[in-house]
From Swiss-Prot:
Name recorded for this polypeptide: Putative HTH-type transcriptional regulatory protein M1425_1284
DNA-binding region: 136-155
Lineage of the species this protein comes from: Archaea, Thermoproteota, Thermoprotei, Sulfolobales, Sulfolobaceae
Keyword Lipid biosynthesis: no
UniProt keyword annotations, A-Z: DNA-binding, Transcription, Transcription regulation
SMART domains listed in its UniProt record: HTH_XRE
GO molecular function: DNA binding; DNA-binding transcription factor activity
Keyword Ligase (UniProt): no
Organism: Saccharolobus islandicus (strain M.14.25 / Kamchatka #1) (Sulfolobus islandicus)
PROSITE patterns: HTH_CROC1
HAMAP family hit by this protein: HTH_type_cro_C1
A Pfam family annotated for this UniProt entry: HTH_3
Domain spans labelled HTH cro/C1-type: 125-180
Length: 310
């Protein structure tokens, strides 16, 4: 984590009097979440001087999509007025771009591997076209694109090039231009299930995933933050599951940071304990704990029947 950029981010948040918490696990540079911002929806922030890894982006995507919010990667590699779309609900911005997001300013330009595009509000486009009496063919001809392209614009399946955006504004006005981050989040369908690493008898986490999925629960596996799993039941209740690791002090730090993450993402924290010493201490601290050989109690808790209360 870059000290210079993190200080910029904190200054921006404190200037706007936002409530936030720092996530300080794991304690090395490669982690997926640095800050959780408490706004209308929790926003995850990763601050990086370098390019973020696929694993970091994967964690950010899973948490953001499961909470229907945004993950922001703040880096000097991005231009001020352009957002890079890294994955579903994961957006990279410059420190200047981050300030605009926090100030509520609209950012409408974004970059993908296919080029630079402008975010449009598809529902406003369709409403204005129908209100003004234009057919899809009329608009396609005016823009110089296919009828299918107009269908895609109106369904929200495609955004537009700068050239097409200028013509749309001439025809319908600039209120059809959207915000890359928040308009994308609002229209995003929640994705819960995914392919998990194949069952491995040597890995406790792998066995746990297998048992949870076997009981009809939706699982997302995390690698570079304090929680190990996001679990959702059929009623869409969300749990963060954290597993004790080999080092006592690191485990205590992990649990503390996972508690912060759970609080800000409005999730319930469940801790899996692997030693008797840790079990007693965690129960004294008020954590909801389960022993590794008693996974059925954890499953009962999540499914709402006979869960053991700590």
């Amino acid at each position: 984590m870059s000290k210079k950029i993190i200080n910029e981010v904190i200054d921006i948040l404190e200037d706007k009097k936002y409530t936030y918490t720092m996530i300080e696990y794991p304690e090395h540079n490669r982690k997926s979440v640095d800050i959780v911002l408490n706004s209308k929806e929790p926003t995850l922030i990763r601050v990086s001087e370098d390019k973020v890894t696929k694993e970091e982006i994967s964690d950010l995507k899973k948490i953001a999509v499961s909470t229907l919010t945004a993950s922001l990667v703040v880096t000097n590699e991005e231009e001020e007025d352009i957002v890079s779309v890294k994955a579903d609900n994961v957006f990279a911005v410059s420190p200047e771009g981050f300030k605009k997001v926090i100030n509520g300013e609209k950012i409408f330009l974004y970059r993908t591997r296919g080029g630079i595009f402008i975010k449009i509000r598809n529902y406003i486009l369709k409403h204005k076209r129908e209100e003004m009496g234009y057919s899809i063919g009329d608009v396609a001809k005016f823009l110089g694109v296919s009828r299918k392209a107009i269908y895609d614009y109106e369904k929200g399946d495609s955004d537009v090039s700068l050239e097409v955006a200028e013509k749309l504004i001439d025809l319908f006005g600039d209120d059809i231009i959207g915000d890359v981050i928040w308009d994308s989040i609002k229209g995003k369908k929640e994705v819960i299930e995914e392919d998990i690493t194949e069952f491995s008898p040597e890995s406790f986490k792998s066995k746990l995933i297998y048992k949870l999925k076997e009981n009809g629960l939706n699982i997302l596996s995390l690698k570079l933050t304090a929680a190990d799993l996001i679990v959702k039941d059929n009623e869409n209740n969300r749990y963060l599951v954290t597993i004790e690791n080999k080092d006592y002090n690191k485990s205590m730090k992990k649990f503390y940071e996972a508690k912060k993450l759970a609080s800000y993402t409005k999730s319930e924290l469940l801790i899996i304990i692997r030693t008797s010493k840790m079990l007693k201490e965690c129960e004294d601290l008020g954590y909801k704990t389960y022993e590794e050989n008693d996974i059925h109690s954890l499953i009962d808790e999540i499914k709402g029947s006979n869960g053991r209360q700590s």
